[in-house]
């Protein structure tokens, strides 16, 4: 699974996922299913934001290419992927500026058009079950919830899906592609089933013990695209960098 994650996702996303797991004392090399889930969630958050802007009249528009000097503001602020201190700094700044109620838990995005925080969910289970779990955790009608599944289903607060149909279809297609690529490598069942994942983990740990004495080569590359997660007022090229996040999984 770890090899699949590193091949399938943009290096920026992989680095952010590794950083997030290490912040909580988790090892991406051991908890590989969680590693894959975090990368998937990060990519969906970026895709949710990509190409969506607010023009000088305050209208929401979609721009895939055009004048980089146009008076456009990113519609969504990406909170997911930042370290907790910076994430709360951004949330507090948004609340102080807009007057929106501060959430109890860190959300994933902020929508400047609808003036609301958004919690994004990506589930391997039934969307309505995961939606209820999210709603029970958030416990706030002010935070909008939007759930996607790997089967193309989705569910959102008050059936308000925020994005246009084409943007949502792009996310669903990407999730379906990830599922197909996992299945073709024999990884999907363990990704979905905790019991199978536990069995696979024991197998991986045993394999690591056998290979402990072998030399390894490690890359310490740092992606310049990490700058795209600076606060919006510090960022000038976010859209171009985020487009690189939506790479297709390579063919086997």
Swiss-Prot record:
The keyword DNA damage does not apply. It is found in: Host cytoplasm; Host nucleus. The active site is at 80, 108. Its main location: host cell. One of its GO terms (biological process) is viral RNA genome replication. The record marks 195, 198-199 as: Important for efficient shutoff activity and nuclear localization. The record marks 202-203, 206 as: Important for efficient shutoff activity. InterPro entries: PA/PA-X, PA/PA-X_sf. Pfam families: Flu_PA. Keywords: Decay of host mRNAs by virus, Eukaryotic host gene expression shutoff by virus, Host cytoplasm, Host gene expression shutoff by virus, Host mRNA suppression by virus, Host nucleus, Host-virus interaction. One of its GO terms (molecular function) is RNA binding. Plays a major role in the shutoff of the host protein expression by cleaving mRNAs probably via an endonuclease activity. This host shutoff allows the virus to escape from the host antiviral response. Hijacks host RNA splicing machinery to selectively target host RNAs containing introns for destruction. This may explain the preferential degradation of RNAs that have undergone co- or post-transcriptional processing. Belongs to the influenza viruses PA-X family. The probable endonuclease active site in the N-terminus and the basic amino acid cluster in the C-terminus are important for the shutoff activity. The C-terminus acts as a nuclear localization signal. The C-terminus is recruited to host protein complexes involved in nuclear Pol II RNA processing. This is Protein PA-X. The gene is PA.
């Amino acid at each position: 699974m770890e090899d699949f994650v590193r091949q399938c996702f943009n290096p920026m996303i992989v680095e952010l996922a590794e950083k997030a797991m290490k912040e909580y004392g988790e090892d991406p090399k051991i908890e590989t299913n969680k590693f894959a889930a975090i990368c998937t969630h990060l990519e969906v958050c970026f895709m949710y934001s990509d190409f969506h802007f607010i023009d000088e009249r305050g209208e929401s528009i979609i721009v895939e290419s055009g004048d980089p000097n146009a008076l456009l503001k990113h519609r969504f602020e990406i909170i997911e992927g930042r370290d907790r201190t910076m994430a709360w700094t951004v949330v507090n700044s948004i609340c102080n500026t807009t007057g929106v109620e501060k959430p109890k838990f860190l959300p994933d995005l902020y929508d400047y058009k609808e003036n609301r925080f958004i919690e994004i969910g990506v589930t391997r289970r039934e969307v309505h079950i995961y939606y209820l779990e999210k709603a029970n955790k958030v416990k706030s009608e002010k935070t909008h919830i939007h759930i996607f599944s790997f089967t193309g289903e989705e569910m959102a607060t008050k059936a308000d899906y925020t994005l246009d149909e084409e943007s949502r279809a792009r996310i669903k297609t990407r999730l379906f592609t990830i599922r197909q690529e996992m299945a073709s490598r024999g990884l999907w069942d363990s990704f979905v089933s905790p019991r199978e994942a536990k069995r696979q983990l024991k197998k991986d740990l045993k394999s690591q013990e056998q290979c402990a004495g072998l030399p390894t080569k490690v890359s310490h590359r740092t992606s310049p695209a990490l700058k795209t997660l600076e606060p919006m007022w510090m960022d000038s090229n976010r859209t171009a960098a985020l487009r690189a996040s939506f790479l297709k999984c390579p063919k086997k």
